[in-house]
Amino acid sequence: MEFKYNGKVESIELNKYSKTLTQDPTQPATQAMHYGIGFKDEDFKKAQVGIVSMDWDGNPCNMHLGTLGSKIKNSVNQTDGLIGLQFHTIGVSDGIANGKLGMRYSLVSREVIADSIETNAGAEYYDAIVAVPGCDKNMPGSIIGMARLNRPSIMVYGGTIEHGEYKGEKLNIVSAFEALGQKITGNISEEDYHGVICNAIPGQGACGGMYTANTLASAIETLGMSLPYSASNPAVSQEKEDECDEIGLAIKNLLEKDIKPSDIMTKEAFENAITIVMVLGGSTNAVLHIIAMANAIGVEITQDDFQRISDVTPVLGDFKPSGKYMMEDLHKIGGVPAVLKYLLKEGKLHGDCLTVTGKTLAENVETALDLDFDSQDIIRPLENPIKATGHLQILYGNLAEGGSVAKISGKEGEFFKGTARVFDGEQHFIDGIESGRLHAGDVAVIRNIGPVGGPGMPEMLKPTSALIGAGLGKSCALITDGRFSGGTHGFVVGHIVPEAVEGGLIGLVEDDDIIEIDAVNNSISLKVADDEIARRRANYQKPAPKATRGVLAKFAKLTRPASEGCVTDL
């Protein structure tokens, strides 16, 4: 790949940060430490590139990132004037943690990742950053950390997993979650239940549908912070290896031209990112994370920007969880660049936004494949969309005065009026499924699991999957002050602000109340008289904090509401 910059090129020191340590004659101990890690005399004038991966053995999404990081380091070291230094930060496997209290740490991990990247690179004076994320919160955490530093940076996505298979049926992580509901209702044998679990995840790579990881990778490539094809190159592919081999030249180009995240992550670039999320039918988590990434670079993006773009952007991608296809299928027809090329042709994107190649978004995709709408139905044309407007809708009303996020594919309808069934937490809901407490026409209300009340705003993938598996996915709705996995589908509303423990009306809902959700008029309302609401509020007792020490308590104290991205950056 060729790299270029259309702006004015000025002479610049590539090591303008690291020279603070390597060239200062009053820092002999610093320089001795560098000799200790193997530096030669000639290395002290090189620009230092920090290569951070979220590699660890315990998650298929992340188990290969160390290998990719080593390839990137080799690419950097083979590039004249650069030296690569690897470091690592943490991750949380949403697929493993979902359904248990450990899921409270997932969103928190985004902030820990951002803080640790900023901390390490800031302390070590790295001149540039390459981040290698895999699982969901890894991506926004990486971008937030790089945005705070505002030094030349590139994100290399770890890549998507291949599909699993059992008895001729293609499987993915959500297949395993939904098998629970089938088991509870007696709709799957023990043998097949075990068979699904054993075969859903065949190896390394992020969960394969248009779930949160692939959604965020697509958004960040469109934003301009990854090389073209990074989002759709599979974890196990020659293309992903080739991408790693290109990073040395790519990051040197950014250093030479002093192209920083602030040059790339503009308001228009974020609008492009939101557009691709809508077109691909992406995760509700994109709302939280794009708002947070924009905040880190000083660009104001709100929930209302999502609604504005949703109103004029159709869903074209037929991807799981609500559709048929996986990210590996998009890769076969040209990946994200093919979709971007089509959208640019149709006037749906800002083509003049700068990217990490030094080229504009439009220049990046000039040679991408053209989508053939006769030979594939993974991506539909604008004139034949899956849904005429975006699937992510921002709803307001007395249940969500600060807003909420609905994921409405259109397959489940756009209006739901039903009877409330209240659950104080995730396990309470699962118990309700097992006891037959939920029936067609009900609105499940799961509360006290928001950013403060959770704390950590855990995902409700286990409940929504159990609902689908139990055969209630098309006849029940679910609302929560928590959030959803990218694997969630059905009539669901999350991110309700204010959350229950912050005085939100969701904390006052009782069984048999009537709740109305209108995705056409963007409203969510509790149909209870004002005097009855006042009576309940007078008698309300706020639950005691679930965490009083440690990182969860810290998050609960610092976090902004979901409508502001749950950022903790003061």
UniProtKB/Swiss-Prot annotation:
<comment type="similarity">
    <text>Belongs to the IlvD/Edd family.</text>
</comment>
<feature type="active site" description="Proton acceptor">
    <location>
        <position position="485"/>
    </location>
</feature>
<protein>
    <recommendedName>
        <fullName>Dihydroxy-acid dehydratase</fullName>
        <ecNumber>4.2.1.9</ecNumber>
    </recommendedName>
</protein>
<keyword id="KW-0001">2Fe-2S</keyword>
<feature type="modified residue" description="N6-carboxylysine">
    <location>
        <position position="137"/>
    </location>
</feature>
<dbReference type="Pfam" id="PF00920">
    <property type="entry name" value="ILVD_EDD_N"/>
</dbReference>
<dbReference type="GO" id="GO:0009097">
    <property type="term" value="P:isoleucine biosynthetic process"/>
</dbReference>
<comment type="function">
    <text>Functions in the biosynthesis of branched-chain amino acids. Catalyzes the dehydration of (2R,3R)-2,3-dihydroxy-3-methylpentanoate (2,3-dihydroxy-3-methylvalerate) into 2-oxo-3-methylpentanoate (2-oxo-3-methylvalerate) and of (2R)-2,3-dihydroxy-3-methylbutanoate (2,3-dihydroxyisovalerate) into 2-oxo-3-methylbutanoate (2-oxoisovalerate), the penultimate precursor to L-isoleucine and L-valine, respectively.</text>
</comment>
<dbReference type="InterPro" id="IPR042096">
    <property type="entry name" value="Dihydro-acid_dehy_C"/>
</dbReference>
<dbReference type="InterPro" id="IPR050165">
    <property type="entry name" value="DHAD_IlvD/Edd"/>
</dbReference>
<dbReference type="GO" id="GO:0004160">
    <property type="term" value="F:dihydroxy-acid dehydratase activity"/>
</dbReference>
<dbReference type="GO" id="GO:0009099">
    <property type="term" value="P:L-valine biosynthetic process"/>
</dbReference>
<dbReference type="InterPro" id="IPR056740">
    <property type="entry name" value="ILV_EDD_C"/>
</dbReference>
<keyword id="KW-0411">Iron-sulfur</keyword>
<comment type="pathway">
    <text>Amino-acid biosynthesis; L-valine biosynthesis; L-valine from pyruvate: step 3/4.</text>
</comment>
<feature type="binding site">
    <location>
        <position position="94"/>
    </location>
    <ligand>
        <name>Mg(2+)</name>
    </ligand>
</feature>
<feature type="binding site">
    <location>
        <position position="459"/>
    </location>
    <ligand>
        <name>Mg(2+)</name>
    </ligand>
</feature>
<dbReference type="InterPro" id="IPR004404">
    <property type="entry name" value="DihydroxyA_deHydtase"/>
</dbReference>
<dbReference type="InterPro" id="IPR020558">
    <property type="entry name" value="DiOHA_6PGluconate_deHydtase_CS"/>
</dbReference>
<dbReference type="GO" id="GO:0000287">
    <property type="term" value="F:magnesium ion binding"/>
</dbReference>
<keyword id="KW-0028">Amino-acid biosynthesis</keyword>
<keyword id="KW-0100">Branched-chain amino acid biosynthesis</keyword>
<dbReference type="InterPro" id="IPR037237">
    <property type="entry name" value="IlvD/EDD_N"/>
</dbReference>
<comment type="subunit">
    <text>Homodimer.</text>
</comment>
<keyword id="KW-0479">Metal-binding</keyword>
<feature type="binding site">
    <location>
        <position position="207"/>
    </location>
    <ligand>
        <name>[2Fe-2S] cluster</name>
    </ligand>
</feature>
<keyword id="KW-0460">Magnesium</keyword>
<dbReference type="InterPro" id="IPR000581">
    <property type="entry name" value="ILV_EDD_N"/>
</dbReference>
<comment type="pathway">
    <text>Amino-acid biosynthesis; L-isoleucine biosynthesis; L-isoleucine from 2-oxobutanoate: step 3/4.</text>
</comment>
<keyword id="KW-0408">Iron</keyword>
<dbReference type="Pfam" id="PF24877">
    <property type="entry name" value="ILV_EDD_C"/>
</dbReference>
<feature type="binding site" description="via carbamate group">
    <location>
        <position position="137"/>
    </location>
    <ligand>
        <name>Mg(2+)</name>
    </ligand>
</feature>
<feature type="binding site">
    <location>
        <position position="135"/>
    </location>
    <ligand>
        <name>[2Fe-2S] cluster</name>
    </ligand>
</feature>
<dbReference type="GO" id="GO:0051537">
    <property type="term" value="F:2 iron, 2 sulfur cluster binding"/>
</dbReference>
<keyword id="KW-0456">Lyase</keyword>
<feature type="binding site">
    <location>
        <position position="136"/>
    </location>
    <ligand>
        <name>Mg(2+)</name>
    </ligand>
</feature>
<feature type="binding site">
    <location>
        <position position="61"/>
    </location>
    <ligand>
        <name>[2Fe-2S] cluster</name>
    </ligand>
</feature>
